[in-house]
Amino acid sequence: MSQQTTIRDTGEAAATNAPANSATSTSTPDNQPTPLDAFEVLLITGMSGAGRSHAADCVEDMGWYVVDNLPPKLLIPLVDMMTTSGSGSGSGVHKLAAVIDVRSSYFDELAAVLGHLDDLGVKTHILFLDASNEVLIKRYESVRRPHPLQHGNRLIDGILEERHLLEDLKERADWVIDTSSLSIHQLSTKLYETMLGSGPTTVAVHIFSFGFKYGMPIDADFVADVRFLPNPFWVPNLRELTGHDKPVADYVLSSKGAKEFLDAYEKAIEIALEGYAQEDKHYVTIAVGCTGGQHRSVAMSEELARRLRAHGLNVTVSAREQHKRHSS
């Protein structure tokens, strides 16, 4: 079976999905070159069927730049290209994760490559995913695919050969995770606990206000309709203001039903976020709408964000219709 090296397009997507408290990033400020002694390399390896691909997804969410199926011999030139040691200006990337297995070309050169990286002062880490032979057999049988080292023999023969080839690498791994009894979500939690020293960070929340007259949002997990509140648009001295202005915010938040709605919605969101965290969902979008997206929805979005932040949540707020005026 042929393999293809894949460089994932992380960019802003990885930065957006990364946990708020992970303190990792895919680039240095203003995309400046990264010196070698500030560069880190993570090798994701282990038994086929033990969860390498999912581990790579989690690591990507932590802010690492991930490359799939990278031949070990290409690690040095890739690091060289991404740092100030190369002839270019560097890429700004300072955390590179490479998924490597025994099928990678020149796998036997990996030890020498790691030694070279150590000599260069590059911090290297190895994450090794493992599982029992019995579990690996069940996983392969469930997907009805042959083991990459099976070569027409029994499945257990391929597993045992791979285990033998990876024995030394497992011995020098920084982290070894046995996934035999772990679900996908449990593996995610284990990775965060192991690599970051804590469980998954609180789900990041983005709240945005919008106007129903401009269309329903298609990217929201929750949509709140606050058109039941009195409309400041019909108050002459408030019409030209927005929900960001205190007079409008005071008017909206003191309206009958506003506090009761916020109390109930805040509680519902808290319950949902707890469930999302257990299901390994890292990002939730809440849309709050009124007629034109200028007054009621803006004020309620800001107040909801304030309340959720008080619970220690990472919350951002935006106004979809901020460039549209004269209707709410």
Curated annotation (Swiss-Prot):
Residue stretches of biased makeup (Low complexity): 13-29
Keywords tagged on the record: ATP-binding, GTP-binding, Nucleotide-binding
The keyword GTP-binding appears for this protein: yes
GO molecular function: ATP binding; GTP binding
Taxonomy, superkingdom: Bacteria
Gene3D superfamilies registered for this protein in UniProt: P-loop containing nucleotide triphosphate hydrolases (3.40.50.300)
Cystine pairings recorded for this chain: none
NCBIfam families noted in UniProt: PRK05416.1
Family listed: Belongs to the RapZ-like family.
Function, in words: Displays ATPase and GTPase activities.
Official protein name in the record: Nucleotide-binding protein Blon_1085/BLIJ_1109
Species of provenance: Bifidobacterium longum subsp. infantis (strain ATCC 15697 / DSM 20088 / JCM 1222 / NCTC 11817 / S12)
